[in-house]
């Protein structure tokens, strides 16, 4: 049921009070919940609790919801995804709503868990913000309203994935068919179903897999991590590339303890950052009717790759992984007949960080001869790095220096830009695109870890 005017006003009136509490509020919430319901430690990424990324993401989302609640209420009958014509009104909340729903699906969130979260959220509001019974009742109704939206959307996501060819719900056992070290800190894993001869669901290029690990050497709790799929969509296998972070637990475990033949538990592919290809005549790559050239899902604009529209892939560091899946996909779908301009613009710390250089070079030579590649290296080793071969420009990324790109934008070709990488890199790329007055519907980005708006 729609929320009453009294409920909406009460939540709007206290949104700033919650915001003023800052991270103290969300840290208190998580401490309370994870102490009283320790089973949820099997769901939450505890490293994101320690570095405060998850508390910050929750605070931003909660405040955005409270401030947008009136307009969200107007759309409650439609649920998610939000109609494109209303998206601009709700950027504060729906910019992250669909992304959150996919992340929840990847860790297997169930409706009963929303009740647990809601109880602890209300208790934290009472302890930290106000004990006013009318306001607490309003927040209770507002939370139930929000939980209903997410439960409904997540069930749609679960059902869609489960009903697809090769699809499943929750987790499924996969065997490590290949494991290869491609740089000092990156291993590639090829994963096939444990049940020989069974299909896997097609992923959309840019999506990720959640890997479920339970090992006492890591933690007494189950660990879940999401890794971007690097392979092109197929029904036989998935490939992921795992970068070992300095403070990592699960990536280190996968590097050091998981071998060929071992089994891993995986959730299906999820994620709202992807390139969705449209065949001529309005058909999606899976053959389903697709009359709309752009598919809007929450706050993410998932580009439908029309034949002439330029595509610009801009990875920073390990941000190559989801974009490599897009590049492989385009190479398979279009190949040497490709008529669109396609750019691969890689910004890396040094030449050793170019994990997929050989493959991108091979794609350019054999599959996409029109692919335009440009590399920026923050640090150049003049004793070993050759300009024009190992890199094109020294220093940080500058889109103005990419041959032909500024001209393409100025000519009104309306390229679509996909970028993934470290936070500073992503802010820099977005600022450069904004300086060119690139519209938001042509800017697509993914952020590893809890989502936060680029600033």
What are these regions (language model features)?
Residues 1-171:
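Globin-like tetrapyrrole-binding proteins
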Residues 164-270, 274, 279-283, 287-293, ...:
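Ferredoxin-reductase
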Residues 206, 319, 422:
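Short, conserved phosphate/pyrophosphate- and ester-handling motifs at nucleotide-, phospho-/glycolipid
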Residues 310-312, 418:
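Conserved beta-strand elements of the Class I
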